[in-house]
Amino acid sequence: MGAPGLRAATAALGLLLCAGLGRAGPAGSGGHGAPGQLLDDDAQRPCPAACHCLGDLLDCSRRRLVRLPDPLPAWVTRLDLSHNRLSFIQTSSLSHLQSLQEVKLNNNELETIPNLGSISANIRQLSLAGNAIDKILPEQLEAFQSLETLDLSNNNISELRTAFPPLQLKYLYINNNRVSSMEPGYFDNLASTLLVLKLNRNRISAIPPKMFKLPQLQHLELNRNKIKNVDGLTFQGLGALKSLKMQRNGVTKLMDGAFWGLSNMEVLQLDHNNLTEITKGWLYGLLMLRELHLSQNAINRISPDAWEFCQKLSELDLTFNHLSRLDDSSFLGLSLLNALHIGNNKVSYIADCAFRGLTSLKTLDLRNNEISWTIEDMSGAFSGLDRLRQLILQGNRIRSITKKAFAGLDTLEHLDLSGNAIMSLQSNAFSQMKKLQQLHLNTSSLLCDCQLRWLPQWVAENNFQSFVNASCAHPQLLKGRSIFTVSPDGFVCDDFPKPQITVQPETQSAIKGSDVSFTCSAASSSDSPMTFAWKKDNEALQDAEMENYAHLRAQGGELMEYTTILRLRNVEFTSEGKYQCVISNHFGSSYSVKAKLTINMLPSFTKTPMDLTIRAGAMARLECAAVGHPAPQIAWQKDGGTDFPAARERRMHVMPEDDVFFIVDVKIEDIGVYSCTAQNSAGSVSANATLTVLETPSFLRPLLDRTVTKGETAVLQCIAGGSPPPRLNWTKDDSPLVVTERHFFAAGNQLLIIVDSDVSDAGKYTCEMSNTLGTERGNVRLSVIPTPTCDSPHMTAPSLDGDGWATVGVVIIAVVCCVVGTSLVWVVIIYHTRRRNEDCSITNTDETNLPADIPSYLSSQGTLADRQDGYISSESGSHHQFVTSSGGGFFLPQHDGAGTCHFDDSSEADVEAASDPFLCPFVGSTGPVYLQGNLYSPDPFEVYLPGCSSDPRTALMDHCESSYVKQDRFSCARPSEEPCERSLKSIPWPHSRKLTDSTYPPNEGHTVQTLCLNKSSVDFSTGPEPGSATSSNSFMGTFGKPLRRPHLDAFSSSAQPPDCQPRPCHGKSLSSPELDSESEENDKERTDFREENHRCTYQQIFHTYRTPDCQPCDSDT
């Protein structure tokens, strides 16, 4: 019953009571009581004539009173003076009402809070709503010490400035005023008691920070204000708040942490605002939230992690918003949600797993959306809703229902499909819902063909007839008839008015910026207008460029075929996705397969590696990054391969997610070209960067002092390392080196060769190497000792004077017979000419005698590099020297694959020269190589020559000192029963004409004799036996200067050793196979065999050319 009815009943009851009591009167009174007075059974309880009395309530409302009735009964506990014209209160009229606790002065003409006098301290509830109060003054309220409820609604209060006095107030209502500003701390004196605060329908536009320090407040209402933004921590201090209502404020922005501190709040109502997005930022801290009402907003997006802090939510209202899609993360984390209301949105897309996490959901309201495509074409949209009881899908423009549309809804009890013009339902579309109790379906558009025959029987079996109103629209004979009135035989399939897809769109790949088209066709027997649509990733394409065609196609009757072409211009990466065509008419829609479009773009570099020069030991950093679609893979190569020295040593680092390639502790072997390759399915691009490593100069080998005999060749080594390769300069005794015709530099000044050394050459030689990083110096001391005396004058090399140099020749003393106990050393000094002998794979030059090159150029790291011929500048500055070899002799190749290269000094550089494949093209190791030159260093060098045979065979040649031909004898030990044959076969004799014709004229010969000795006759390690005379001679080349012509009589004759007696040589011809092949061409060549005391002499003619004045001479040594 309403308030007016209650008041009427109360008044009627009061009149009856007054009339009855007035007639009865007290016993013996003899008359009536005072008119207008109410008396109870125990005593008289007077009630003013203008009021109504009911229990402890005195109701004087709606009497147009301008002053209080007088007198008021003292028993009044509740006094209602609302809806009068009171403008002031007479305190004297209330002073005797000591029991008064509740006063209602609503809708009067009061302009201030009235003073009720002494009884104010007893008042618990004071209602002053609907007056003209414009201020709340603390002094006006101080007397109400027991006040618990104060209603100041519907007044003219415009500001809340002066703080409330300390009261026991629990309920404060200041609704529908003109409050536009509030002072922080205004309610602080009510902090311990206030439970409910209502500030609805005011003009509040902002809430000041720390406005509400009310730890006991449970309910706060701010509806219908003008709050547009809510800053973070706005409601801090309301730790006990249970509900907050901010409806109809026009809120557009909720900052992060807007509701932080409301950890106990359970209900939040934000309906009728302008929020556009739900994010976890403004929901932060709402850990106990149970209900969230967001209807009538403009929400169009739910961020993936929005519900991270609201996982206890049980009811969510999102009705009347702008949601168009529900993604698989839209409700992630809401496992306790019981009711979800998304009605009256624009939802057209529901992801397959959109509801999968809602395991407790019981009610899902999706009414008045556009999810027809989700129901018609997708399966599993409602999977995961294991406890769903009610599903409302009315008004969603659903036209057909597939068999899998409601997969997973096994517990559904209520399904509402009303308001949809459903045309077809696949067989057993509802069969999996075993607990279904209500199915609401009303449609008049059904296609009553053979595929719908199951529906009437199933509805009847489940007693759903009262909820289903369905009639046929096709065929024409059944149009308008209820499906329950059509016999099963009436559902036939004579045609197919619903479109049937005949041409499916095809999956494609395209380059960014190109044009793409998809084609789709469908056929139908109906002439109903056809509509075409395209979807991308299950969402309708708006404003798509389409071309639509229609034509007749005969196939057992007249059929119409419809074709739609989707054209995509200048495709971008955002164009990627799955495209599907939807062709519809009045009878339903058909959906094509989904064709995938992939957009590719050739990679392009955003960071290109740059050339880098860095010191050894530092860290190299190369950057490389590329973009493309799909994202390109970055790969690195070094010098075209994947062999990284830094990788083997675990000094290389490539971060998969980084753009930087690191090499720590850079070394010389890291030098090279590094290639960065970016590759994807569209192609690949590469960029190169050169890494240069700088290293300070250093000595790769220790500097060794040298001791040579006067007249010998001295070779000083300074093998330099560094990057860039250092420049070398030699000084002698801390002074610039005076370069003479006897000084030669080789291998980039790493070798200093002094020919025909003299005592004046002795001293301290300093090698200074320098590059851009620094300078390094080292000293070598050269000692020159006088020439040792020899037993035979024939062993002494003829002297050379400076005027006789035509070719820089080297005459080396060999076969020195010294005191018993001194070692016998076979030493060969060989300086080869610059003309390359073709049998050693060296190109011959024409007639000009130039110095030969060092066999292999030594790089700064001491490794063998390519040959470099030509002139180089000496470090002294102005003087130029030709790069020459420390060995000047010929190398005699052995064509059966065995051979050895010998040199004329004891330097390691000569040993390295032996490994040059251009000079010694054989296979194997050399064995010991004996170097002549230093009489005090007879030790052999064990050298492996990659191109030489493993059979150590020595080619010994005589040095020609004058223009004659002399006959030399070469001795070899007799190792077996056939020494001559084996020794002669072991000597690598050259092709006689090929070797000699390149240097000497064919009209002169040279005889060589070989002695075959007993095995004990020669010992390389212990020296000669007494009485054994041997010679070690070499056939020398030139350095480009003419030799002085020596005296002919110096070698005119030679003595036969006393122990050389004729011995039989088994009658075998021991000449070289090559010499045999040349015997017919050169009849001057002859072989002479003699055997003397187990020694054989092999004599062969060499045609040699030294100078035009050379005379042939036959000499026996």
Curated annotation (Swiss-Prot):
The keyword Transmembrane applies. Residues 1019-1093 are annotated as: Disordered. Residues 499-598, 603-692, 697-783 form the Ig-like C2-type domain. Keywords: Cell membrane, Cytoplasmic vesicle, Developmental protein, Disulfide bond, Glycoprotein, Immunoglobulin domain, Leucine-rich repeat, Membrane, Repeat, Signal, Transmembrane, Transmembrane helix. Disulfide bonds join C520-C581, C624-C676, C718-C767. Residues 444-495 form the LRRCT domain. Widely expressed. This is Leucine-rich repeats and immunoglobulin-like domains protein 3. PANTHER family: KEKKON 5, ISOFORM A, SYNAPTIC ADHESION-LIKE MOLECULE SALM. PROSITE patterns: IG_LIKE (PS50835), LRR (PS51450). The chain crosses the membrane at residues 810-830. Its main location: membrane. GO terms for biological process: otolith morphogenesis. Glycans are attached at N156, N274, N442, N469, N688, N729, N1014. LRR repeats lie at residues 75-98, 99-120, 122-143, 146-168, 169-189, 193-214, 216-237, 240-261, 264-285, 288-309, 312-333, 336-357, 360-382, 387-408, 411-432. Disruption phenotype: Mice display circling and head tossing behavior, due to a defect in inner ear morphogenesis. In mutants, fusion of the canal pouches starts earlier than normal and involves an abnormally large region, leading to truncation of the lateral semicircular canal in the inner ear. Nevertheless, hearing seems to be normal. Mutant mice also display craniofacial deformities, and especially a dramatically shortened snout. Residues 1-24 form the signal peptide. Residues 38-74 form the LRRNT domain. It comes from the Eukaryota. InterPro entries: Cys-rich_flank_reg_C (IPR000483), Ig-like_dom (IPR007110), Ig-like_dom_sf (IPR036179), Ig-like_fold (IPR013783), Ig_I-set (IPR013098), Ig_sub (IPR003599), Ig_sub2 (IPR003598), Leu-rich_rpt (IPR001611). It holds the Pfam family LRR_8.
